[in-house]
Amino acid sequence: MKFLFSVILVIISFLGISKIVNGQIACPSPFLYRATNDTVGDYDLGYQYINIGKPLPPQLSFLNNCLMPCQSSFFEQDSWNSFNKLVKQMGAVAFTCSAIIMIIYGPLMNRSFFKFDRHTITVFCFALSTFFIGVSDLMFATNDVDMVCPESHRYARQTDKTCATNGVLFQFGWLGSVMWFAFLSIDGFFRASGKKMNKIAFAIVLASIWILNIVLSFAPMGGDQYGAYFVGQVNCWILVKNWQYAFFWAELIVSLAIGFVGICLTIYSLIRKTSDGNTLKHVTPLILVFLLFCQYLYMIIFYGIINEKKDHYQNILAEQVGCIFNNALAKMKVPGIVYAGECTFNETITFSSQYAFLFFVRLLGIEIFAFYLFSKETLLLIKSSYIATMFGLGDKDAYDVELEETD
């Protein structure tokens, strides 16, 4: 962690920096001292202490009251700038891509939408979900870091401006994409095998997914769970890992299981129909579902590691800062302080793993666009759309005829 080397330079430049600066207790830059006896209450307000995690000599006891900066010291500022830039730029692209697919597959252009066409509605719902992720990213782009860091050393909480809204939008979009990915895999199997689904059954599935998504997105507000996490996310999201497991990761695990079954059944159906001239057109959606499966799998592995090792990562950072200051005070011959030897710098979260996580979440909206925009199905939807037929450029039955022939 290169950040810690900058701490060393600060210490050296100030000859070990005293804990008293102009009569005020000071912490090493970029940390900030906060006098408190209620660290738990402060956490609820958004303050994150470095938490040395072990008894300290009196001369160093002030370090337990040092606040972590927002955004956190797990990454250098250049790294955070890269993360923020990725979310802003890629989020805007994903928002636009999702909106285009929503328009084509939604009721504005899709004549089959209100006929409860299973496939087009499923694609629309997935695009709608990634659209909400894009909206949350645009909120971050508009408000910048102030949305997650209302103060230099305080992380946003649900009571802060825009954080609750951003958290709900992100959760709603991300969770929705997960559940509709699962159904997209089942839809692929139905299309590849030629099986049909009762429209009433599909209506029940449609309503159930959206109702469940709404409940799981708004319920965390009852526990004041939305806020800025000091690692993993750039947006506001669910703070406590047990709440994350209950309201997101459990649903993702179930969706991955369904997705895996759907992928296997689709492959099996395609193998059985290798002589069918329509087999190739089912391969592209299968590739999309497989890529989504891999991305969601990476997300759960990454966040699982983060959640399980969060306290460990904090302790590494805290111990390294404590070691540096201990040695600095020892060199100043402060009574009672013993030189602790060379301070080691252990890796916590790599830049590439964090970047990949943020990238994969934003890639969802771009993928649905890339895989469906130029498909034959999309071209038929455009040809049969209200707008195309209004100007005499299309055939209102084009998509339905294709559907009858192949589905």
Curated annotation (Swiss-Prot):
Localization per record: Membrane
Record membrane topology: Multi-pass membrane protein
Signal peptide: 1-23
Keyword Transmembrane helix: yes
Name this polypeptide is given: Frizzled/smoothened-like sans CRD protein J
Gene3D superfamilies, A to Z: Rhodopsin 7-helix transmembrane proteins (1.20.1070.10)
Cytoplasmic topological segments: 111-120, 191-199, 268-285, 376-407
Alphabetic keyword roster: Coiled coil, Glycoprotein, Membrane, Receptor, Signal, Transmembrane, Transmembrane helix
Provenance organism: Dictyostelium discoideum (Social amoeba)
Glycosylation sites: N37, N346
Any one GO cellular component localisation term in the record: membrane
PANTHER family tied to this protein: FRIZZLED_SMOOTHENED-LIKE SANS CRD PROTEIN J, G-PROTEIN-COUPLED RECEPTOR GPCR FAMILY PROTEIN
Transmembrane segments: 90-110, 121-141, 170-190, 200-220, 247-267, 286-306, 355-375
Extracellular topological domain: 24-89, 142-169, 221-246, 307-354
Similarity comment text for this entry: Belongs to the G-protein coupled receptor Fz/Smo family.
Taxonomic lineage from the root: Eukaryota, Amoebozoa, Evosea, Eumycetozoa, Dictyostelia
Main localization category: membrane
InterPro entries in UniProt: GPCR_Fz/Smo-like (IPR050949)
Domain of life: Eukaryota
